């Protein structure tokens, strides 16, 4: 599972998910990517499930890049506990994803294989996603 090695503070505010992603909106490492169309918290378990679905379908062929990292802790209080008496204990880790963010990239496989692998991965995630290709820009030195 993905999680930070160490953090400065154990608990964090929930925050707000406004607007579109600032960076990481283009495919850089592979040839194909999976882009978020909605904003959400994506847990480390969901990221791992999507990664497994992709690698299992590609049968160890090609390479997978994970472009999101779960660096935000979320807390939960135990069941049947009354309100109040402080914030709950850290429960897990989430990555904050905004629309436009490329979450996964795939390289070294054909477009059909990449499309199906990323489709399987998108079913493991709680948001709508779309398949994107690397933009070929000419004239770069």
Swiss-Prot record:
The lineage of its organism: Bacteria, Bacillati, Bacillota, Bacilli, Bacillales. PANTHER family: 50S/60S RIBOSOMAL PROTEIN L16, LARGE RIBOSOMAL SUBUNIT PROTEIN UL16M. Binds 23S rRNA and is also seen to make contacts with the A and possibly P site tRNAs. It comes from the Bacteria. This is Large ribosomal subunit protein uL16. The keyword Manganese does not apply. One of its GO terms (cellular component) is cytosolic large ribosomal subunit. GO terms for molecular function: rRNA binding; structural constituent of ribosome; tRNA binding. It comes from Geobacillus kaustophilus (strain HTA426). The gene is rplP. Part of the 50S ribosomal subunit. Gene3D superfamilies: Ribosomal protein L10e/L16 (3.90.1170.10). The keyword tRNA-binding applies. Keywords: Ribonucleoprotein, Ribosomal protein, RNA-binding, rRNA-binding, tRNA-binding. HAMAP family: Ribosomal_uL16. GO terms for biological process: translation. Belongs to the universal ribosomal protein uL16 family.
